[in-house]
């Protein structure tokens, strides 16, 4: 009996290690990108989910458009270098929105089991890690 258990343990150990390592390294699936800008008069919310980008102004749906797969890949690749767990620690280049009436913004990434939110930042001057993503989302809603 001990020999059988030893043989099974020896043959199953590499498989268990492979399962554990591959499960640990694979990222969770991104479900939704939620970007919001608020200024003195208007609150704009951009929601990107399932190749659909929606624009809301003051909680009213203004526009909804389908995004091409190529653009989806660009958006997701721009997020690949960003660790979502550390999103709340992004360095804010400017805090002008606090005193000059500039629009303030916030990004929220929603995954299968967790969501991660950035600190509030100046909408015209996002953290360097988001400098591709934010303009891309705003441009896609205008183009489509």
Q: What are the roles of these predicted feature ranges?
A:
Residues 11-22:
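Bacterial N-terminal signal peptides
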Residues 62-96:
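Mature extracytoplasmic domains of secretory-pathway proteins
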Residues 2-12:
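Bacterial N-terminal signal peptides that target proteins for export
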